């Protein structure tokens, strides 16, 4: 029997991680085409995660990176269009808010049903390029799959059809549970000479934190202040973008700050699990913090995870030295006193991939009939 032909499009580390369980299940139940746009082209930012998460190689690699953001976005749409014309998928699924998600514009023009994971997330901060993409992808998609009721309310306010909008939960619990033995087996602490609870883990790579000089300097000064205040190593998982800016601006770190290339999925989560505090601008830290129960501070001024704030999973620390250090002090003291957050219902489901696969199978025919009026 002919199976439904699904095209999954990814392009960045978070997309690969969060889609990994869905990719495996789609391989099992669909005629599945896996596409990597090449938005992140550094080995440590994508290929290593395919290996760690037990994913096969993509069927197609688009190589979309151009000489500027505009050319890259245009390449995403153009190259995705050409590929869709060639392979003729029955449906397309994307996750999140990256440039790679703009590939669905091609699918829309070709009248291919579109499914969007992580739909409805909003931080209400127009300085974030992701916020613009979220709105575009939400209203362009045919079926929106939200993590939480917060997200569903946000997206319904934009006028999308409620009958094509579902809350499926975050996929991270399913992903993390599946690889927990490998995370536990990681020897990264010993390899790096770190002790449990005696280091701070830092990840900062967002455009607004790195490319805006005032924000960059403020955040880097906060890093040095943390090292001095707590007199312990600060391990900075440093993305290529961040490393270039540090070199360009000649910033000097405290001797206790350790710059390290991006780590593999198992090693990074082992480090999060055992850190004195995790300080990050990553969008996944609320979900990982909810799973592992580590003290977490977000070095941002907004969040698209209000459901995690509702339960006290993390603290927003802004990016000034004083505010970040205050947030770290509060988060670590509360954790030491056993004053920990409540579980986030949207982050506990371990069968998200099953729900997503069934929704795709259910709605391709409905979208073709009700939206595109196909026979």
Enumerate the language-model features and the residues they cover.
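Nucleotide-activated sugar donor-binding and catalytic core shared by glycosyltransferases
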Residues: 1-232, 242-375
């Amino acid at each position: 029997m002919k199976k439904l032909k699904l095209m999954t499009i990814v392009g960045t580390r978070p997309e690969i991680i969060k889609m990994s369980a869905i990719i495996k299940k789609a391989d099992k139940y669909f005629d599945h085409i896996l596409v990597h746009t090449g938005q992140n082209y550094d080995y440590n930012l994508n290929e290593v995660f395919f290996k760690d998460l037990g994913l096969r190689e993509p069927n197609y690699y688009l190589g979309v990176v151009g000489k500027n953001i505009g050319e890259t976005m245009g390449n995403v749409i153009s190259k995705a269009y050409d590929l869709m014309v060639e392979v003729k998928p029955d449906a397309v699924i994307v996750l999140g808010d990256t440039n790679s998600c703009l590939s669905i514009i091609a699918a829309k023009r070709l009248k291919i049903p579109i499914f969007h994971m992580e739909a409805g997330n909003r931080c209400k901060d127009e300085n974030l390029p992701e916020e613009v993409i979220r709105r575009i992808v939400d209203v362009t998609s045919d079926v929106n799959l939200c993590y939480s009721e917060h997200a569903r309310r946000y997206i319904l306010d934009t006028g999308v059809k409620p009958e094509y909008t579902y809350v499926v939960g975050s996929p991270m619990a399913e992903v993390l549970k599946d690889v927990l033995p490998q995370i536990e087996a990681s020897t990264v602490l010993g390899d790096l000479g770190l002790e449990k609870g005696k280091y701070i883990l830092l990840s900062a790579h967002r455009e607004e934190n790195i490319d805006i000089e005032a924000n960059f300097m403020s955040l880097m000064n906060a890093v040095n202040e943390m090292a001095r205040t707590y007199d312990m190593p600060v391990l900075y998982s440093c993305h290529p973008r961040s490393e270039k800016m540090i070199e360009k601006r000649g910033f000097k770190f405290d001797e206790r700050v350790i710059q390290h290339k991006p780590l593999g999925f198992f090693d990074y989560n082992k480090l999060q699990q055992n850190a004195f505090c995790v300080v990050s601008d990553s969008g996944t830290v609320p979900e990982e913090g909810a799973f592992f129960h580590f003290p977490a501070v977000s070095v941002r001024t907004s969040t698209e995870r209000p459901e995690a704030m509702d339960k006290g999973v993390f603290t927003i620390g802004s990016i000034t030295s004083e505010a970040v250090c205050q947030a770290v002090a509060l988060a670590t003291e509360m954790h030491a006193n056993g004053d920990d957050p409540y579980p986030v219902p949207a982050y506990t489901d371990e069968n998200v991939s099953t729900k997503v696969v069934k929704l795709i199978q259910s709605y391709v025919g409905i979208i073709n009939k009700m939206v595109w009026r196909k026979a």
